[in-house]
Amino acid sequence: MTDKREFEIVYDTELPGTPERVWEAVTRGTPAWMFPTDQWPAVKTVEERPSHLVSRMEGPDGWFNQLEHVLEPLDGGRARLHYVHSGIFTDDWDGQYDGASKHTAFYLHTLGQYLKHFDGKPVVFTDVQAPAASQAPEVFERLKQALGVAGSAQGDTVELEVDGVGQLSAEVDFSNENFLGLRTADTLYRFFGRNAFGAPVGMTVHDFSGQGDAEATAKAWAGFLEKVYA
């Protein structure tokens, strides 16, 4: 029997950018902090720039996926975001809800990092997936050990030598049992412990250096991940 039920994920946060800058980031700038979304055309059912945006996709049998952003200006060039992700999960409702909720917190944290450190800079986006062996339980910790950040906490500065990639001077801007964020002077590295949600470990690279090469980046990091999960 298909477990088909509606869900709603609500997240409230403050962001280091004006509503206008947040609006730009969540509409046209998603490769800078999440992933490209232009391959999924959505109908904007509400578009009141820069305060209220609702984007919705619909499918057969009543399926839908909807994102709502409500933005309020705050002092100091900041904004308050009220975010609501709603829709229908068709299988493993509890597992999908858990995964989507935790990804939401990490993505919106990354949005804040982008707005604070790289807002408006051109980005080269790269998505890399680890081998299928990374779906096993407890393997995200193996990645942290291979990177050299297993003992590091959020806010720590680290000097890393990544096999096949090179040296990274970074701040650990996010770290928990499922996700890791590293920020260098010109790049955001996002690591996803999706093994906890039944999928391989993955990562994204958001390169603001002006010299990014998605193909070379993908090759280097894929080689590293293959060694970690050999």
Identify the function of each model-found stretch.
Residues M1-Q39, Q96-A150:
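Hydrophobic ligand-binding cavity/cleft-lining segments
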Residues Q39-E48, L71-E72, V149-S152, L168-F174, ...:
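Short, exposed beta-strand/loop patches in secreted or surface proteins that constitute
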Residues T2-K4, E8-P16, E20-G29, P41-K44, ...:
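Terminal targeting/leader modules
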Residues V123-D186:
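Acidic, Ser/Thr-rich low-complexity intrinsically disordered segments
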Residues M1-D3, M57-E58, S101, V158-E159, ...:
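Intrinsically disordered, low-complexity segments enriched in polar/charged residues with Gly/Pro
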Residues R56-K102, D173-A230:
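Beta-strand/loop substructures that line and gate deep hydrophobic ligand-binding cavities in soluble
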Residues E8-I88:
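Ordered, small/hydrophobic-rich secondary-structure cores
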